[in-house]
């Protein structure tokens, strides 16, 4: 009888140890995946949130809500990564290109903040609206600090043509997402300043970036950052129209012309972009294309008000952009998920 009890007791102890081991294994697995979330994944979710706003404007609000929920979960996970793995994050942040892409985190927070303010207002949930507003202002402030540090470090203290890449625009012009999303924040003076700053920094940096791309070879790991050229001019178009209503026709026309040229460049380069085996840098294709849609939609509305016959053409171009961008964002999201969850190819 005692021997049977000992045997049963031993089996229970072994089973308990195995259960504890399994739990610890899962915890370590989840922590490992959390730590290894690549920085470009932030830009991909930024594109998803932007694209969901486009679909929301077309009437697909459920899809928008789903994307905003997924984006919220992702941002929380990434903030946990920053808190739990500061050494990993600082190592990423110390490298110029990943550092420039970290600005996408605050850009996501601006979009989410404006969304929750909208939801809180529409559904009569004041607390949610207040939270949204706080998140938005914190995101703008953090982005501003990051921007000042980035400019001081990479434009004045250290200058390296090899690390001067279009990804810089994520930091330099990314703060203009505040102008895209901040209409309900009662912060017009701030938005005016950001719009003027964004247009000026784009005009200053564009020839530098073009010269760099034409004269210095781009390494494969940064190849897809070339597509980011579409983002700053698109942000300028949207910001000018959002903030000023009827901006100077020459200024907004120039910015949109730059956006169209950048879009054509991306479309021509698509075969080259997809000649690479997938890696997180593919995310460089996503947000620029998504904000490019918003720029075309805003420009179509601007031209309609001006009575221009080009409005219909620009509106149709936006349709093509929605098609291309949806495919690109979906592809990058799926492939990033496969990398994160280590799904191998099947023969």
Task: Enumerate the language-model features and the residues they cover.
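Hydrophobic, membrane-facing alpha-helical anchors
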Residues: 18, 25-30, 76-90, 139-156, ...
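Juxtamembrane helix-loop boundaries in multi-pass membrane proteins
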Residues: 27-52, 87-114, 132, 136, ...
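A structural motif
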Residues: 46-74, 110, 121, 136, ...
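C-terminal transmembrane-bundle signature of multipass membrane proteins
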Residues: 47-53, 71-81, 209-212, 235-347
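Helix-coil boundary and interhelical linker segments in multi-pass alpha-helical membrane proteins
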Residues: 53-62, 116-131, 180-192, 240-251, ...
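Structural signature of hydrophobic alpha-helical transmembrane segments
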Residues: 63-75, 128-144, 189-202, 250-260
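A generic, well-ordered mixed alpha/beta core segment in the N-terminal half of proteins
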Residues: 114-154
